[in-house]
Amino acid sequence: SLSVKDKAAVRALWSKISKSSDAIGNDALSRMIVVYPQTKTYFSHWPDVTPGSAHIKAHGKKVMGGIALAVSKIDDLNAGLLELSEQHAYKLRVDPANFKILNHCILVVISTMFPKDFTPEAHVSLDKFLSGVALALAERYR
């Protein structure tokens, strides 16, 4: 679970990177479909699933909106992300293993876009936070 120190580190990092969240989301989702091509199956209804396409940008923005929500609900991720968990479990039917894949891509993108802010301490706190988000999103799968 997240310590007080982890929560403070996540909030501090988010305050620095949130202005770039659309670009982070686009790059992370683009990276995910290239590095893990099996994830494209969730987007097969889109006419263009190439990195940086309009649909990828729009969904990347939506994903990062979810991350922003999670930061605001950091003290109770399960309750705060319940609606998103239900949507991913029942409507979208996303395999929860993919949350970990996308989390990894988000970490990679943030590390490359914000190398000075992505200290080892920020890295571990953000990784723990994103793992908590993935667990909260998987809550309705049980």
UniProtKB/Swiss-Prot annotation:
Disulfide-bonded cysteine pairs: these are none
| Classification via CDD domains | Hb-alpha-like (cd08927)
Q: Which residues form the Globin domain?
A: 1-142
**Binding positions for O2 per the UniProt entry:** 59
Q: List-wise, which residues carry N-acetylserine?
A: 1
Tell me which tissues or organs this protein is expressed in: Red blood cells.
Where heme b is bound, by residue?
Answer: 88
GO MF terms listed in the record are: haptoglobin binding; heme binding; iron ion binding; organic acid binding; oxygen binding; oxygen carrier activity; peroxidase activity
GO terms for cellular component: blood microparticle; haptoglobin-hemoglobin complex; hemoglobin complex
Tell me the SUPFAM superfamilies matching this sequence. Answer: Globin-like
Q: Which PROSITE patterns match?
A: GLOBIN
Task: Indicate whether Transferase appears among the record's keywords.
Answer: no
Domain of life, per lineage:
Eukaryota
Q: What else is known?
A: This fish has two hemoglobins: Hb1 (major) and Hb2 (about 15-20% of the total). They display the Root effect and the alkaline Bohr effect, which is enhanced by organophosphate and to a lesser extent by chloride.
- Subunit composition? Hb 1 is a heterotetramer of two alpha-1 and two beta-1 chains.
- Record family assignment: Belongs to the globin family.
- What functional role does this protein have? Involved in oxygen transport from gills to the various peripheral tissues.
Under the heading PANTHER family, the entry gives: HEMOGLOBIN FAMILY MEMBER, HEMOGLOBIN SUBUNIT ZETA
Q: What is this protein called?
A: Hemoglobin subunit alpha-1
Tell me the name of the encoding gene. Answer: hba1
